Amino acid sequence: MSKILLNTVEEAIESIKRGEIIIVVDDENRENEGDFVAAAEVITSEKINFMATHGRGLICTPLTEKKCKKLKLDRMVSSTSDPMDTAFTVSVDYRGDDVTTGISAADRSKTIRAMIDKKTRANDLTRPGHVFPLIAKEGGVLRRTGHTEAAIDFARLAGFEPAGVIVEIMNEDGSMARLPELVKVAKKFDLKIVLKDQHIQNDRNYNRLN
């Protein structure tokens, strides 16, 4: 697949700054998948609905370790057998803001925004719920090359709170979308699409210069 079809990391950051959703594609030798990625600070019910409808995977909210400790979001399991070491916490819903069942696009967007609100406390969240926080490794993609860390990095680089919203992108038949299909999705919805490797290299270059 020609790289001409992909965007630069800088273009992706500008898109996140505008409150848009981007596509971040994994390395072929890792999960080999693409995720819709957005900044949690500007998430809306419309964006959640888009991600659920066109992503079809599990909508998750990457957060920093510090934020998860503050909200007492413990890991879902004490010891994981997941080879990717995806750090799921217990799922949550927000108690306030007229949240009802917790599963609607509106309810999930309210829960996500509540989690990054500095005034929210641990007891403001019910457990279990319908939003799945993920604990990101400190140091971003240079520490762990996951979509979890990439989402945090993109949000931070765009000037938002270090928290994201991600969902895996599947094809209509339920199979995982790979790069050729992901490029088509990006074109269809006019979204920026980048390889995670580009972002990792961008971070390495930045660290060498600073």
Where are the language model's segments positioned?
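Catalytic domains of riboflavin
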Residues: 1-210
